[in-house]
């Protein structure tokens, strides 16, 4: 019998429900239970693909091409697993299916309503995934009380009734503020949030209380009394230095043990040794390197969450802490490359559109001319080709047709299959594709494989008509698409200390114990470069 753990949130958004859900998943997996995580997003968008990163953070891409919420990235990293597009349930998907069924006449003339038709479709989607697992953690996005999440909470309530109380548990994540004036933790917002949840027919089994400092005993007792939750199930999730500490904190607080007992599962000893080692290693790092990320969404760092995490993974493997210098690409256009002075490495991440493109190109030139360890990703890969064409091959005005359709040298062009599309959503080259790597290259030394699968999200590519000229001038295309060798995937400059760019997004497959090879290589090169600089000064 599959066990379900629903994670809801109250008081305010952005409390870390995603990290809490990922941590619960890890605690169950560490006990030897076959576990997966589902994210419910109550927005009406079908998927996260067309959303502005400023509103929603990065769009995470899965192997099957699903463009999903960044929380699924956390689930994949914490559980070291590969999820599918079906693991992200949105209001848009649910309503689409129900409306399609109604049009096909599957409801036989019934009035189609939120209950039972929408709620039934939600339950069907959850159970469809649950078939292969012993434990399923379902995070319901938004805050209790939001109008959008009502059908999902109702579906969860019904599931407890249908599956039996021993098979469905509810964990409610709330916020316990501390008012400076009185210096005590206030439980009233939590009480009201649980009251709201109860009014929907859901009694939480555990409360994860988010706070700046550990939960005081008086606050714990009060929460327990007013929310009808045993004291042992009021979990103190205070702020920690790093998100990877959260599972260990929740385990120490007894959440894993409590949930196994509550769901009538055998309480096995969790195996978290590797995780503990990784966290201890990261916390012990003293040596640092500074890597610049030159992007167009840097005001919201969640826009580049997977890159931040991949750098963290590479920190552990290289025993050096990465400090990120966030640089707005447009600022490079106005203030020049002095903003990059002193960095040990430079990353140009993915992105779309003209804003900040020239600033990114200046940063690429600065990295190339000053031999600073460099990694370009997706749009960063394409702009590296543009920079090289302009400044090495002398192709004045060379550009991507995405930004300048009239460029005299369209070195980056729309892929042929993208030319006649009239829809934006879900139509890019998305998901895991094979990449063939040439032996004897930097890319090969990083991957040690001739064929790898990496995740993509793009419409434009290096124009095959310019490849010969670019290679003649010294640019090496060390990786090509496994399904079409005219499609370039990796480029490098062999005469530089570390200069590489990829059409794919390596950050999406990076894991805490297995950093993405190009990130590992970048941090290693940055560490060596900093040591060299220190010797010469």
From Swiss-Prot:
Span list, region Amidoligase domain = 1-265
Write the Enzyme Commission number(s) for this entry.
Answer: 6.3.4.2
Molecular function (GO) terms for this protein are: ATP binding; CTP synthase activity; glutaminase activity; identical protein binding; metal ion binding
Q: In which pathway does it act?
A: Pyrimidine metabolism; CTP biosynthesis via de novo pathway; CTP from UDP: step 2/2
Reactions accelerated catalytically: UTP + L-glutamine + ATP + H2O = CTP + L-glutamate + ADP + phosphate + 2 H(+); L-glutamine + H2O = L-glutamate + NH4(+); UTP + NH4(+) + ATP = CTP + ADP + phosphate + 2 H(+)
| Residues bound to L-glutamine | 54, 351, 379-382, 402, 459
The annotated modulation of its activity is: Allosterically activated by GTP, when glutamine is the substrate; GTP has no effect on the reaction when ammonia is the substrate. The allosteric effector GTP functions by stabilizing the protein conformation that binds the tetrahedral intermediate(s) formed during glutamine hydrolysis. Inhibited by the product CTP, via allosteric rather than competitive inhibition.
One GO term under biological process is: pyrimidine nucleobase biosynthetic process
| Residues noted as binding ATP in the record, renumbered to the chain | 14-19, 71
Q: Which residues bind Mg(2+)?
A: 71, 139
Amino acids binding UTP: 13, 186-191, 222
* Residues covered by the Glutamine amidotransferase type-1 domain: 290-532
Record InterPro entries: Class_I_gatase-like (IPR029062), CTP_synthase (IPR004468), CTP_synthase_N (IPR017456), GATASE (IPR017926), GATase1_CTP_Synthase (IPR033828), P-loop_NTPase (IPR027417)
Q: What class of enzyme is it?
A: ligase
Which domain of life does the protein's organism represent? Archaea
Subunit structure, briefly? Homotetramer.
* NCBIfam families named among the record's database cross-references: PRK05380.1, PyrG
Miscellaneous information on this protein: CTPSs have evolved a hybrid strategy for distinguishing between UTP and CTP. The overlapping regions of the product feedback inhibitory and substrate sites recognize a common feature in both compounds, the triphosphate moiety. To differentiate isosteric substrate and product pyrimidine rings, an additional pocket far from the expected kinase/ligase catalytic site, specifically recognizes the cytosine and ribose portions of the product inhibitor.
What's the protein name? Answer: CTP synthase
Q: Which organism is it from?
A: Pyrococcus furiosus (strain ATCC 43587 / DSM 3638 / JCM 8422 / Vc1)
């Amino acid at each position: 019998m599959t066990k379900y753990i629903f994670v809801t949130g109250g008081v305010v958004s952005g409390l870390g429900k995603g990290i809490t859900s990922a941590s619960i998943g890890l605690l169950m997996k560490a006990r030897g239970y076959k576990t997966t995580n589902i994210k419910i997003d109550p927005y009406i968008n079908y998927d996260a693909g067309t959303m502005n990163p400023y509103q929603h953070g990065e769009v995470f891409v899965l192997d099957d091409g699903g463009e999903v919420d960044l929380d699924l990235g956390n689930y994949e990293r914490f559980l070291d697993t590969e999820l599918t597009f079906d693991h992200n349930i949105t209001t848009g998907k649910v309503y689409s299916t129900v409306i399609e069924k109604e049009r096909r006449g599957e409801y036989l003339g019934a009035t189609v309503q939120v209950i039972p038709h929408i709620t039934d479709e939600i339950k069907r989607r959850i159970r469809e995934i649950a078939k292969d697992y012993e434990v399923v953690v379902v995070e319901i996005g938004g805050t209790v009380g939001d109008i959008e999440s009502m059908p999902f909470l109702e579906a969860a309530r019904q599931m407890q009734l249908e599956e039996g109380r021993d098979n469905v548990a509810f964990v409610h994540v709330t916020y316990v503020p501390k008012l400076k004036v009185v210096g005590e933790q206030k439980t009233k917002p939590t009480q009201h949030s649980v009251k709201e949840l109860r009014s929907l027919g859901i009694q939480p089994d555990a409360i994860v209380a988010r706070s700046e400092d550990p939960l005081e005993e008086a606050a714990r007792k009060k929460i327990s009394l007013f929310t009808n939750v045993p004291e042992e199930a009021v979990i103190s999730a205070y702020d920690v230095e790093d998100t990877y500490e959260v599972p260990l904190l929740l385990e120490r607080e007894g959440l894993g043990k409590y949930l196994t007992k509550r769901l009538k599962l055998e309480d096995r000893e969790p195996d978290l040794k590797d995780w503990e080692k990784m966290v201890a290693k990261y916390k012990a790092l003293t040596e640092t390197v500074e890597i610049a990320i030159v992007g167009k969404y840097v005001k919201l760092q969640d826009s580049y969450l997977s890159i931040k995490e991949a750098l963290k993974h590479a920190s552990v493997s290289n025993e050096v802490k990465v400090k990120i210098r966030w640089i707005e690409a447009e600022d490079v256009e106005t203030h020049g490359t002095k903003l990059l002075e002193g960095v040990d490495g430079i990353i140009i991440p993915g992105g779309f559109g003209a804003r900040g493109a020239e600033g990114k190109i200046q940063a690429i030139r600065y990295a190339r001319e000053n031999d600073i360890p460099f990694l370009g990703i997706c749009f960063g890969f394409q702009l590296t080709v543009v920079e090289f064409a302009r400044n090495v091959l002398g192709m004045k005005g060379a550009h991507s047709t995405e930004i300048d359709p009239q460029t005299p040298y369209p070195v980056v062009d729309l892929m042929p299959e993208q030319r006649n599309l009239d829809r934006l959503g879900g139509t890019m080259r998305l998901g895991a594709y094979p990449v063939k790597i040439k032996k004897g290259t930097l890319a090969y030394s990083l991957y040690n494989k001739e064929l790898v699968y990496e995740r993509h999200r793009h419409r434009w590519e290096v124009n095959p008509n310019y490849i010969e000229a670019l290679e003649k001038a010294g640019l090496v295309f060390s990786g090509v698409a496994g399904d079409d060798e005219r499609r370039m995937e990796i480029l490098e400059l062999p005469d530089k200390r570390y200069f590489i760019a990829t059409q794919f997004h390596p950050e999406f497959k990076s894991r805490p114990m297995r950093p993405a090879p190009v990130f590992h290589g970048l941090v290693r090169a940055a560490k060596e470069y900093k040591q060299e600089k220190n010797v010469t000064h």
